[in-house]
């Protein structure tokens, strides 16, 4: 971009919510944040640090817009049959570095979905990419105590929740499972799992364009 004659670069991180990636890794990669430990870790992962004379600005993550709520509302509506009998559980990656930001975003999203659909019970859990799925299981169990049917959606860009759920269920298989013979707390629950994440959706594409354009307009 510098060689092409760009006078300014606006980097829009396609990330769900604030994390170590948005706050430290990406800025360090782009040369606008300096931390020897972060830079060492990035180099060990094969990343090449960028150093340019062109001013670089990193913008906010998706959670600062209403895009996630609007897309997940569509996912829930696709799965919903009788809102009065249903609960919704939202799963997301979460961040050990900045947990409050994720908790606020998940609470806001579930509240919005419930308000728009008439579903009266909602919960959420930060599960990484499935390594903390026991948190999801606990949320689903509790939801199933309140409602007959539990809709589970994920705030992930490229995946739904079915794959994570399948890995969890496989742990209890008699053959090849990690915990054969143990009681599966999710067995027999009436769960409806979203197969699709946030993408593909035009709202995400438009958010990228709008975010970059807004930054340029605010700071010409």
Each model region followed by its residue ranges:
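Extended amphipathic ligand-handling, pore-lining, and cofactor/metal-binding catalytic surfaces
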Residues: 1-220
């Amino acid at each position: 971009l510098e060689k092409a004659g760009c006078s300014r670069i606006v980097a829009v991180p396609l990330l769900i919510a604030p994390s170590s990636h948005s706050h430290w890794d990406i800025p360090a990669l782009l040369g606008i944040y300096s931390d020897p430990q972060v830079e060492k870790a990035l180099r060990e992962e094969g990343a090449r640090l960028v150093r340019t004379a062109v001013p670089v600005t990193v913008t906010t993550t998706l959670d600062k817009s209403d895009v996630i709520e609007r897309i997940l509302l569509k996912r829930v509506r696709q799965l919903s049959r009788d809102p009065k009998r249903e609960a919704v559980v939202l799963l997301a990656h979460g961040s050990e570095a900045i947990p409050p930001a994720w908790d606020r975003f998940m609470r806001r999203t579930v509240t919005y979905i419930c308000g728009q659909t008439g579903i009266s019970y909602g919960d959420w859990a930060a599960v990484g990419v499935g390594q903390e799925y026991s948190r999801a299981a606990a949320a689903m169990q509790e939801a199933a105590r309140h409602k007959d049917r539990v809709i589970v959606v994920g705030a992930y860009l490229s995946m739904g929740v079915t794959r994570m759920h399948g890995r969890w269920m496989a742990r209890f298989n008699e053959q090849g499972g990690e915990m054969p013979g143990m009681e599966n707390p999710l067995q027999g629950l009436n769960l409806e799992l979203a197969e699709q994440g946030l993408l593909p959706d035009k709202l995400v594409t438009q958010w990228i364009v709008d975010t970059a354009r807004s930054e340029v307009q605010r700071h010409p």
